[in-house]
Regions:
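Eukaryotic N-terminal low-complexity, Ser/Thr- and Lys/Arg-rich leader segments
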Residues: 1-33, 191-202, 265-275, 340, ...
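N-terminal "arm"/small-domain region of PLP-dependent enzymes with the aminotransferase-like
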Residues: 2-105, 421
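Short catalytic/ligand-binding loop motif for oxyanion handling, primarily in non-cytosolic enzymes
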Residues: 52-59, 214-217, 247-250, 291-293, ...
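Conserved core of the PLP fold type I
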Residues: 70-236, 240, 246-275, 282-286, ...
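Conserved core segment of the aminotransferase class I/II
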Residues: 264-353
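Conserved PLP-binding active-site segment of the aspartate aminotransferase-like
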Residues: 302, 388-402, 423-455
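Conserved glycine-rich beta-strand-loop-beta hairpin in the small C-terminal domain of fold type I
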Residues: 345-360, 364, 373-397
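Conserved PLP cofactor-binding pocket of PLP-dependent enzymes
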Residues: 413-440, 470-480
């Protein structure tokens, strides 16, 4: 826990100005709004049109799972009929109560935040959790709840490709904030905000992936996070902290705190004036990278007023996340407990650290300054300390003074593909479709022999393109000379 009993939440009314036009029109479900009353002792409910559980064919569920404390051991988890029942029926829009409780405890434990709803109680910080069908489901609903057509949205650049169509669908104006190996370049963000055109709508949200960013692999430093958080307070915007790779951190230094953690411990106000209001971070987690991508279980953590609007979107669209997958997830987590869950995540991060090392070793050998490269370095990169991606640029121009803009799309989709290797052109991660020479490569699935072969094929591709360009320039020079 942060131990600061003076920390308190921003009032619910603070978020009124952050709601989108459509969010203000979403209606509460007349049926689901009464679900909690069914649990009142002595109540005979004629409320919901729930199917009779006795007609369901499922009587129990068993599965085996790895034991985090013993790599050679498995544990059988059985969910008997009475405990299986909640997973076979409609459940609360916010999530299965058992899973919500477990995840809330996890957020308290990992991020040091004190849970409590509506700011009631000493030190209570006004946040809660909602379960979604993966974190992207929740991110879309959060943005839809906060951004109206034409509103500007601050997005780190390059940015996770999955949110670009989302912002375009919602007709947002994507304002790019450049990043480097240390995270969002806070000085660039400050400059944009200080020089914002008068009379134009100001941004209400900033979207960022602070650990192992997809695509760049960057992990934001503590100082950068502090600077961004100070700007959020000064210029009044909400940080959308999309953090699927938080538990995949394998750096040599201590993992920097999350924005969600930091806002409750960092001095508040531009000048550190001691203001104690929290609630400018809406955090998104997922079990996809650490338990199973197929579970489609994510969770949003943040101000209750914003979570209420996300839940309204869910209630008016898909009603809820699958009760059964939530129940399976809960029973796995309950059987492990928090300590073994965190032990499991450390093992997962170590798995990816080893994958990272294998990939970088091959990258250095075939495209860096290793024994296989007599032509000098053919690519440049920064090694990630979290996640599963490398972001690198090929050195295709023979003339170091050349300034022509490169685009990796043709290189990858035509030349590399012809040589039997694929990566992702960096252009797809540019919010407004700019060209870029960068390429994203994922190292999560490949065995070492495949990594070596992939790097050999990329090297061949780069050398072929360099040779073709050199020949073309020589030919152009000859033509130019002959015309004199």
């Amino acid at each position: 826990m942060n131990g600061n009993s003076k920390v308190k939440a921003l009032p619910a009314s603070f978020y009124d100005d952050f709601l989108s036009d459509q969010a203000k029109e979403w209606l509460f479900s007349p049926i689901r709004g009464l679900f909690p009353l069914e649990k009142t002792p002595g109540i005979i409910s004629l409320l919901a049109g729930k199917p009779a559980p006795s007609t369901f064919p499922f009587t129990s569920l068993s599965f085996t799972a790895k034991d985090p404390t013993n790599e050679t051991s498995e544990t059988t988890i059985t969910i008997p009929q009475d405990q299986l029942a909640p997973g076979l029926q409609y459940s609360d829009t916010t999530g299965l109560p058992e899973l919500l409780g477990w995840v809330t405890g996890l957020q308290e434990r990992v991020h040091g935040r004190k849970h409590g709803r509506n700011g009631v109680g000493e030190g209570v910080e006004g946040w809660r959790v909602s379960i979604g069908s993966g974190s992207q489901d929740l991110i879309y609903k959060a943005v839809a709840a906060m951004v109206s057509p034409g509103d500007p949205v601050l997005v780190e650049s390059p940015v996770y490709a999955g949110v670009i169509p989302m912002f375009k669908h919602l007709h947002c104006k994507q304002i790019e904030v450049p990043t480097d190996a240390h995270g969002i370049r806070s000085e660039s963000l400050r400059e944009k905000l200080e020089n914002w055109p008068q009379g134009q709508r100001r941004p209400k949200v900033l979207y960022t992936v602070p650990y192992g960013c997809n695509p760049t692999g960057m992990t934001a430093t503590l100082e950068r996070k502090k600077e961004v958080l100070r700007l959020a307070r000064k210029y009044n915007f909400i940080i959308l902290e999309d953090d699927p790779y938080y538990y995949l951190y394998y750096g040599k230094t201590v993992r920097p705190p999350s924005y969600f953690s930091l806002e409750a411990t960092e001095p508040f106000g531009e000048e550190g004036d001691g203001s104690d209001a929290v609630g400018r971070v809406l955090r998104f987690d997922t079990f996809s990278k650490i338990l199973s991508a197929g579970l489609r279980i994510g969770f949003a953590t943040g101000p209750e007023a914003l979570l209420n609007r996300i839940d309204l979107f869910t209630a008016n669209s898909n009603l809820q996340v699958s009760s059964l997958t939530q129940l399976i997830t809960f029973h796995l987590l309950q059987s492990w407990g928090y300590d073994n869950f965190l032990l499991h995540t450390r093992k997962v991060s170590e798995f990816y650290r080893k994958k990272r090392d294998v990939f970088e070793k091959a990258l250095e050998r075939w495209l860096g300054s290793g024994e296989a490269t007599s032509e000098g370095r053919l690519a440049e990169w920064n090694a990630p300390v979290s996640g599963m991606f490398f972001w690198f640029v090929f050195k295709l121009l023979i003339d170091p003074t050349a300034t022509e803009e490169e685009d990796s799309r043709t290189l990858i989709e035509t030349h590399a593909f012809a040589n039997g290797v694929l990566a992702l052109p960096g252009t797809v991660f540019e919010p407004n479709g700019s060209k870029t020479p960068y390429v994203r490569a994922s190292f999560s699935l490949l065995e070492e022999r495949d990594v070596e072969e992939a790097m050999k094929r990329l090297r061949k591709t780069v050398l072929e393109v360099r040779k073709a360009r050199k020949q073309a320039r020589t030919k152009n020079k000859r033509l130019g000379t002959s015309m004199m």
